Amino acid sequence: MSKNATNTGGKCPVMHGGATEVSISNMEWWPKALNLDILHQHDSKTNPMGPDFNYREMVKKLDVAALKKDMHALMTESQDWWLADWGHYGGLMIRLSWHAAGTYRIADGRGGAGTGNQRFAPINSWPDNVNLDKARRLLWPIKKKYGNKLSWADLIAYAGTIAYESMGLKTFGFAFGREDIWHPEKDTYWGSEKEWLAPSGSEGSRYSGERDLENPLAAVMMGLIYVNPEGVDGNPDPLKTAHDIRVTFERMAMNDEETVALTAGGHTVGKCHGNGDADQLGAEPEGAEIEDQGFGWLNKTKRGIGRDTVSSGIEGAWTTNPTQWDNGYFQLLLNYEWELKKSPAGAWQWEPINIKEEHRPVDVEDASIRLTPIMTDADMAMKMDPEYRKISDRFHQDQDYFSEVFARAWFKLTHRDMGPKVRYIGPDVPQEEQIWQDPVPAGSTDYDIQAVKDKIAASDLSVSEMVSTAWDSARTFRGSDKRGGANGARIRLAPQKDWKGNEPARLSKVLAVLEGIAAGSKASVADVIVLAGNVGIEQAAKAAGFDLTVPFSSGRGDATDEMTDLDSFDVLEPIHDGYRNWLKQDYAVSAEELMLDRTQLMGLTAHEMTVLIGGMRVIGTNQGGTKHGVLTEHEGTLSNDFFVNLTDMNYTWKPTGNNLYEIRDRKTDKVKWTATRVDLVFGSNSILRAYAEVYAQDDNKEKFVQDFVSAWTKVMNADRFDLI
């Protein structure tokens, strides 16, 4: 209850404020605290489906033919409450899908269409997503009908694909299998700006230097998907906009040809909406009144639908026939000269000079009215930028080629964050594998696992070498876009074999041994690398008095150079690894924050992170063999010594440099150990210390080993989608 609520004669029976209102959070009181909440998202407490619900199994029961029929019908069934432009919702549905998928960025794999996050803040209320709430409501009868067999994430992505089909494009295919989340992600960094559409140079700007966009961002402004359609900071200049386009599309793994295809293909159909006063629009969905029921941007002053809709503020269609897949975009863009104009809403747009009457698109509600087509500053970049122009000319001259390139690029856009093809479900999954899917051939399970382990144990490899190599192979996994991991053994290929973080000299030595063992059996190198890590852990556990077998699932395959897109793997290169106590260089972000981000991408919880780091320290897996954080007299033994000594009050901690500390005996002041911020945070952060104390207890030595093995196995199997 609010303290400003009307007094109705009695006191509110609910304790004021704290539980239901947004009060000052711990992170606001203590901004330097670690936000461990990012490790504890999307659990059973927020998911209404129950622990036994498996969407990937449920969607296999979906009647795709019936769904497709219903989706095609929806496209042309205009609703009075939100009219379809020209009687077809295709343009709206394409924008819906595009703006869901278009949040993906390759730097950290976050964003994209894979979770249905467009339903939640902040994305559902971004200025670039004005009126997409209406598109989702139009889809609700479909979602309601197919229920648990169809996620919102799949439906939103599918809507654009069906829209293109209904307007004449031969699509490349579609895969189901995206699982919904039930609250906004807490781990995705969208920028530091304090206002929507803040221009460059404003407080918290994402730009520095000569228009260098901050990593990992892939949009030019807070609240946009890609670029500002009016120009850089709203100032039209197609060549400057071309620079922004190239950067943003590269950051979502698109080359120049794919960029032109997606820009042109996205604007071949549909229109922009700006026929009115944007100031008359109500609040966005998250800020709207309760009676608006999740609708935002309502125009309660004017009609606000059909020809009077205001979305981006730009007004008009790009082509003569906006409900047909054709070559009209390039025909108008390249055959006419264009001049700057202002839309009725006051937005900059380009309009053709002396356009022929037959090239004018008709009004969305009255076909007897002809209107002027438009281009955005981004469209003009396709004509003015020399490289984009070459591609545009080719597409203009060869409609079939344009259609093929676009269909493939659209498939890539809407599936980029789904991971390898093994995760694809449905009758329309293309047979052809794409290199951006990071293909891995099937591996063998027909070999004697124990015999391979015996050969590994008999080699001269140390526990540290075996565990470190297996870890390095697996740590590249990102749950965000399902890339990386141990499957494929790409650690033996360029570029990974040469990454500084993989210690090329040590890696080469270890791989020479493990590849020889693999060659002498039917096992893949990928399996042997993981098995070697398991052997090392078993030896370290035995040294601590625990005889155990680390779980193992065979069947990993070995990728080849031909299956590996070198450039796309650069973003997976580790530039830090708290688990091996290593930083490639000093960064503005603290070492413990970097560790937290990597942990979230790997899909680990806070206690799994805790037990893994404590175990890897005492095993001796530090990068370069450093002794920082190795808080034990028995290196190579899987003991709980790290936590015992970390929580021991007989020691004090003193800084000796940037990210370096000495642990000194309180009585003698003699240096006992050295450590980094990543080590110390498990004693300083109250939550992590609580976990550290659990593992330091005298009665939890076995629990520590068991939990370490469980977390280790989770990392090794993170990319084994064939086991799910």
Swiss-Prot record:
Binds 1 heme b (iron(II)-protoporphyrin IX) group per dimer. One of its GO terms (molecular function) is metal ion binding. There is a cross-link at Y226-M252 (Tryptophyl-tyrosyl-methioninium (Tyr-Met) (with W-98)). Its EC number is 1.11.1.21. CDD domains: catalase_peroxidase_1, catalase_peroxidase_2. The active site is at H99. The record marks R95 as: Transition state stabilizer. The keyword Secreted does not apply. This is Catalase-peroxidase. It comes from Psychromonas ingrahamii (strain DSM 17664 / CCUG 51855 / 37).
